[in-house]
Design a protein with these regions (language model features):
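Single-pass alpha-helical membrane anchors
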Residues: 2-26
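Membrane-engaging insertion elements
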Residues: 24-36
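Cysteine-centered metal-binding/redox modules
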Residues: 33-164
Length: 164
């Protein structure tokens, strides 16, 4: 084997080892989560209440996101949402985080979010890959996308890969 090939192989192996066992920078978006003998990263907001709250608050305030309704009986929110989507209030109310393509309730994400109660009378919490915070299935936002929720680890890892 040529010396260049050995160097390339060594760099690849070093990169793989560094990825799984290396030190993370202070601004890393992920923390480690052990799953069946392997190490997989959990999104940092699932483990960091301050970061999660900051991201959620930004999603509430951002004109282009408008995460809500904070009070599920807030009629004005759903009227605004329906107007934004050019649809009826009834249709807008059916487009929730719980059926959004970015709403992750996979088994591994439930383990990542294992702090506190994940379910209440209105629904359950999941992780929003679009806006990087734990969101509630009964709420919605302007960036809702058809096709969810994420219910398998494989799809969850795919979203994570695209978000790095």
């Amino acid at each position: 084997m040529a010396n260049n090939s050995k160097i390339i192989i060594a760099v690849i192996i070093s990169g793989i080892i560094g990825f799984f066992f290396g030190k993370k920078s202070k601004d890393s978006n992920f923390s480690n989560f052990s799953d069946g003998g392997g190490v997989f990263p959990c999104p940092e907001p699932t483990k960091n209440l301050e970061l999660n709250t900051r991201n959620r608050d930004k999603a509430i305030k951002a004109d282009w996101i408008q995460y809500g309704a904070l009070n599920l009986s807030d009629k004005a929110y759903y009227i605004r949402l329906a107007k934004h989507w050019n649809t009826s209030v009834a249709v807008a109310k059916k487009s929730t985080c719980g059926n959004c393509a970015a709403f992750d309730v996979s088994p591994r994400m439930k383990k990542c979010m294992s702090v506190g109660e994940l379910q209440d009378k209105d629904g359950a919490f999941g992780y929003c890959w679009m806006h990087k915070f734990k969101c509630h299935s009964a709420r919605t936002c302007y960036t809702w996308a058809k096709g969810g929720a994420i219910t398998t680890d494989k799809v969850s890892y795919g979203w994570q890969e695209r978000n790095q």
